[in-house]
Amino acid sequence: MQFQTPIEIAKYMCSMIPHNSIKIMEPTAGSGNILNCLSGYQVIAPSNFFDMEPDFFDCIVMNPPFSSKFAFGIPEGFEHKGMRMGYYILTECMKMSDHIIALMPWFTISDSDVRLRYLKSFGLKSITALPRKTFQYARIQTCVFELDRGYCNETIFRVYDEIIKKKEQNETDKDSEMD
């Protein structure tokens, strides 16, 4: 079963792309919600991430499969040293870009100090907690990581529901001003 990135989440993720970015990769494109939000960029969406030639991108935006049983195109005998599939793809992408925006399971950071330290050493700029209802039928809490190579300040924690409430309030305030 694939879990399609909801369009609102895809838009939120793409809003985090650095302004000077041109060449963007979505290494694990599924139904295309993230891809649809990337118009105006030179987008690379390989049909098989595992067969891709090494390259460098201005930014990578992705929602990788969290488990190898949901990943397509894995080479026979592929060994990823016991890492969960999504985390493996994330670490490979860290070699290909200075900016990564990734929808990941919360346990990527909550059940391993080693993974958290590794992400922070790259530059874990922000983590946005997503609502449990983000993916219907999924039992995994998810979040969006914003990685920026060299970022060494405190990681910013956000709650997606609060971002939406603030945005709606701002729109209401603007409407009130126009009356």
Regions found by a protein language model. Give the residues of each.
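Class I S-adenosyl-L-methionine-dependent methyltransferase catalytic core
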Residues: M1-D179
